[in-house]
Curated annotation (Swiss-Prot):
Taxonomic superkingdom: Bacteria
Keywords, sorted A to Z: Cell membrane, Membrane, Nodulation, Transmembrane, Transmembrane helix
Name by which UniProt lists this protein: Protein ExoD
Protein family membership: To Synechocystis PCC 6803 slr1875.
């Protein structure tokens, strides 16, 4: 199992969902399971279509996405980063939420998010179009997702490891490099693949998530080295 019934995906088959979580003073308390034949892309599309008003909070997104669990919420939060359009402030809020949710996955606990993050308002004018474009990409992935390479998605040890990998992606997503090409896209793809892979028991997709995490780390290391080398060159120029 991905985790015990108190937290997430009940079993490996497509279509099992979590009922809407109950909240008390900003804390997610408990969930119940039901059955749904909706695909992941259909769930995302329906949720996006339900967004109304000029702003939306993460709390409202969590209530809407509750039907298929918090791993799907992690996937949802990556959608704005799958296209080369930066929305100021979103990577910090969404990255922090992903880190806390992945911590809950690692510890096999219901996720708790601070009120400050839950109630942070996000403008829907830019968010909704990017979510729609991201959901279109997920619908293409949906055709190829299936249970395979089970050793990457089964067992308590792999659950914790995969939770840590999603957390690492959230940390990389929060790096203040939004204006640099691919700095949000690469970790976003990693988190998306990991989340969908765990939900659907697709070890190949999980392995793809590992690959993009490594690629992100290497990319950031190259950027860091380039910045350091440029700084050294400038210092030598002014000293000489």
């Amino acid at each position: 199992m991905v985790c015990q019934a108190r937290f997430g995906v009940k079993n490996a088959s497509r279509g099992h969902r979590m009922e809407r979580p109950q909240t008390v003073k900003g804390k997610i308390m408990a969930v119940e399971f039901g059955d749904s034949q909706r695909s992941l892309s259909d769930t995302l599309t329906g949720m996006i279509a339900s967004i109304r008003g000029n702003t939306i909070t993460l709390r409202e997104l969590m209530i809407e996405i509750g039907e298929q669990g918090f791993l799907l919420l992690c996937a949802l939060l990556t959608l704005p980063f799958l296209i080369p359009v930066s929305i100021p402030g979103v990577s910090t809020v969404f990255g922090a939420a992903i880190i806390l949710i992945s911590l809950a996955i690692t510890l096999n606990r219901m996720p708790w998010l601070p009120k400050r993050i839950l109630d942070r308002e996000i403008a829907t004018e830019k968010l909704v179009p990017t979510l729609r474009k991201g959901a279109a990409l997920v619908s293409k992935l949906d055709r190829y997702v299936r249970p395979r390479l089970n050793f990457l998605t089964e067992g308590a040890l792999m659950n914790r490891f995969n939770g840590l990998m999603i957390m690492a992606g959230g940390v990389l997503l929060m790096f203040p490099l939004g204006l640099i090409p691919l700095s949000n896209t690469l970790p976003g793809i990693a988190i998306l693949l990991l989340s969908l892979g765990i939900i659907q028991r697709d070890g190949l997709m999980v392995a793809g998530g590992y690959f993009f995490l490594v690629a992100t780390t290497v990319y950031f290391a190259v950027l860091g080295y380039a910045a350091f080398a440029a700084g050294q060159g400038l210092s030598h120029f002014f000293v000489s």
